[in-house]
Each structure stands twice: as C-alpha cells, then as structure tokens.
C-alpha cells in the first residue's frame, strides 16, 4: 500500500522527489503518513478534500481484500513551515 500511495501522489505533485510515505503497522490497522512539499499540499488534498478522499477510498477497497484497515494521514512538513517562518522575519 505504501508504494500505491507514493505512486499516486508522485503523479499529482510538482515535486515528486519530496513525496515520502511512512508505514506504521498495527494489529488490524496500518497508518500511512504522507509528507509532501508544502506547495503540493493542496494538490494532494484537492478541492474540498476530494483527492484525499479518493485516495482513502482506494485504500479502503484494497484493505478489504487484505482484511486490514488503512488510514492515510497527510502530514504538514515542519521544516517547510520553519523555513517559511524564518523567511518572513
């Protein structure tokens, strides 16, 4: 699933080299943490969250087949925020 999320997100963004997916496995649930470049955050989320919802729907469908639950968490990169804040001063 990690590779699926990476492939889909890399095709959506302007900075595919900054797409990082971390997989955290639990007993029945797997959390996929997605990090993208700050400027690509809107592309991954989409208007009214439609793109993110579509990715989560694909994960849910694939998870049914594997009898696992997959949660996608889109993480804002802290280092991008810090560099942006330091540039504003």
Where are these regions (language model features)?
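RNA-contacting regions in translation and RNA-metabolism proteins
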Residues: 1-41, 53-89
